[in-house]
Swiss-Prot record:
It is a single-pass membrane protein. Keywords: Cell inner membrane, Cell membrane, Membrane, Protein transport, Translocation, Transmembrane, Transmembrane helix, Transport. PANTHER family: SEC-INDEPENDENT PROTEIN TRANSLOCASE PROTEIN TATA, CHLOROPLASTIC. InterPro entries: TatA/B/E, TatB. Residues 178-189 have a biased composition (Low complexity). This is Sec-independent protein translocase protein TatB. It is found in: Cell inner membrane. Part of the twin-arginine translocation (Tat) system that transports large folded proteins containing a characteristic twin-arginine motif in their signal peptide across membranes. Together with TatC, TatB is part of a receptor directly interacting with Tat signal peptides. TatB may form an oligomeric binding site that transiently accommodates folded Tat precursor proteins before their translocation. One of its GO terms (molecular function) is protein transmembrane transporter activity. Residues 178-208 are annotated as: Disordered. Disulfide bonds: none annotated. Its main location: membrane.
Length: 208
């Protein structure tokens, strides 16, 4: 701590021995040791305080540097925000100007002009409605005229079916060999009935 070498310590011990003598030298040595220890302790405490202060100053400096960097970043953010707001304002002004120019270029119809336009458009609508009604009537009239003449259905006369007769057992063989009855077709009222050759045979069969 005091940068004292071995030669210097021996010189101090010889001087103390000559001045104090052999009886007082041990007490003086103890007293000197206590003062040296106290001096070292104080020196260590001062050194620690200085180191703490230096560390605190370094921390302060680092904090100041960090604060300065944060301020710079905040200033940059403010500048960018101002630029963005200015750009948005200019864009809004340009859009509003374009809208105003277009609104001034397109004429605005007054209520009187709108009413006049409605009155002028109503006769055209009535005329078109009349034309469509006439066209619809023209299309429906031929359909009705074509549907009216309907030809009457031909009158058909119903001929009664021949009555079944009960034939006795001896004549069963004769009926088995007889021809089957022929179905008579419907005959119109205006045409005379045609003679069929099977009529005499049927009359003979009906006789007992």
């Amino acid at each position: 701590m005091f940068d004292i070498g071995v030669g210097e310590l021996t010189l101090i011990a010889v001087v103390a021995l000559v001045v104090l003598g052999p009886e007082r030298l041990p007490k003086a040595a103890r007293f000197a040791g206590l003062w040296v220890r106290r001096a070292r302790m104080q020196w260590d405490s001062v050194k620690q305080e200085l180191e703490r202060e230096l560390e605190a100053e370094e921390l302060k400096r680092s904090l100041q540097d960090v604060q300065a960097s944060l301020r710079e970043a905040e200033d940059q953010l403010r500048n960018t925000q101002q630029q963005v707001e200015q750009g948005a304002r200019t864009l809004h002004d340009d859009v509003s100007r374009d809208i105003d120019i277009r609104a001034s270029a397109t004429p605005v119809a007054t209520p009187l002009e709108l009413a006049h336009a409605d009155l002028s458009a109503s006769p055209d609508v009535d005329a078109t409605a009349g034309v469509t009604d006439a066209a619809g009537a023209a299309h429906t009239a031929p359909v009705i005229a074509q549907a009216q003449p309907i030809a009457p259905a031909p009158h058909q006369t119903l001929v009664p079916a021949p009555h079944d007769t009960i034939v006795p057992a001896p004549h069963a063989a004769h009926l088995a060999s007889a021809p089957e009855p022929v179905a008579v077709a419907p005959v119109d009222a205006g045409t005379p009935a045609a003679w069929t050759p099977s009529a005499p045979a049927k009359l003979q069969e009906k006789q007992p």
